[in-house]
């Protein structure tokens, strides 16, 4: 079970961030975290921590993601929330790629993505591959970025299109 007040605010926050309202997104995520913390419901807490990290990542807030990812990882490990554990590793890996630990970060993102694939949780596969490609582009590893982008399946079978525009932008940068 999960607290619907938390769930709705988090996904509304993600949507607002993509629509160009990052400050409103952050406020909704903060509300969700307050509800989750007050409920003392571990799954809602894990969801709130991890999805809030995504919003911080989308805002480019590397230090915040790096500083909060370990707490999300610890909570998810304690309660064996495999999906949110994998996402927390992916986000911490992204932060590492931005903080001069490129190789370690890429490895952590790949390991998180492998865990997601192993449990069939492919909802944010496109997003994760985009993070890998973006980190490679920033480090002038265009061939490696293209390899990650070629794994993205933007077809009718895959309904994960929320990151499609960013994937196309990244493809443009690799050429």
PLM regions: where:
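Short, flexible, glycine-rich and Lys/Arg-enriched loop motifs at helix boundaries
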Residues: 1-4
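Helix-coil-helix junctions within alpha-helical repeat/solenoid scaffolds
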Residues: 9-175
């Amino acid at each position: 079970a999960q607290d619907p007040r938390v769930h709705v605010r988090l996904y509304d926050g993600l949507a607002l961030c993509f629509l160009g309202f990052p400050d409103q997104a952050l406020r909704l995520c903060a509300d969700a975290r307050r509800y989750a913390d007050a409920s003392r419901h571990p799954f809602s807490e894990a969801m709130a921590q991890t999805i809030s990290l995504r919003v911080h990542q989308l805002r480019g807030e590397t230090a915040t993601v790096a500083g909060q990812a370990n707490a999300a990882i610890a909570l998810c490990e304690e309660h064996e929330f495999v999906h949110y554990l994998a996402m927390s590793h992916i986000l911490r890996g992204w932060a590492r790629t931005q903080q001069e630990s490129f190789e370690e970060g890429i490895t952590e993102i790949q390991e998180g993505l492998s865990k997601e694939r192993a449990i069939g949780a492919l909802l944010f596969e496109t997003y994760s591959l985009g993070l890998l490609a973006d980190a490679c582009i920033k480090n002038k590893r265009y061939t490696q970025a293209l390899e990650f982008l070629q794994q993205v399946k933007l077809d009718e079978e895959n309904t994960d299109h929320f990151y499609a525009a960013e994937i196309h932008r990244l493809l443009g940068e690799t050429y």
